[in-house]
Amino acid sequence: VPTINELRIETSYFRNLIDICDKNNTTLVIDCFPVMSCKLTSMLLSYHFLTLWPDIEITGVSGVTGKNDTITHYWLEVSNIVIDITGDQYNIINANELTKSIVMHRPFQPIHIEYRDCSYLHEIFRVNERETFIKGFPTITETFIESMKLDYTKLIGTVKYK
């Protein structure tokens, strides 16, 4: 299992690749990133993690908040560590579209990696779904795996060295 520092290093590297990539040339990284991008980019990040550490188990966490649970978010957890690479979307979205709790936590960093007990994610969002990702993504469709593989290759190709 990777350490929290290893996760921080790889997540920073990966978020940088997403920030600088040509979003017109990727299927899963959309041009309004990080807004409305949490699940797709978290899936790509899980692909990256499983490429580096094929024996780990990753949990994809879906959280909701707001009136009728209309505000959603998605992040990863490895063991007891939360990894969020799209929290900064809540700095961009208009405050009147968000809950007081989200606005009070501003500004959000582009990357949030913290032990679960120290993270604000479980304070702000109620977990409504968890899914497990392991090497090979047996619960994901082949088409989506191919999209991840293709975009991952493009992302990794944008920078030759860490």
Regions found by a protein language model. Give the residues of each.
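A structural boundary/capping signal
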Residues: 1-162
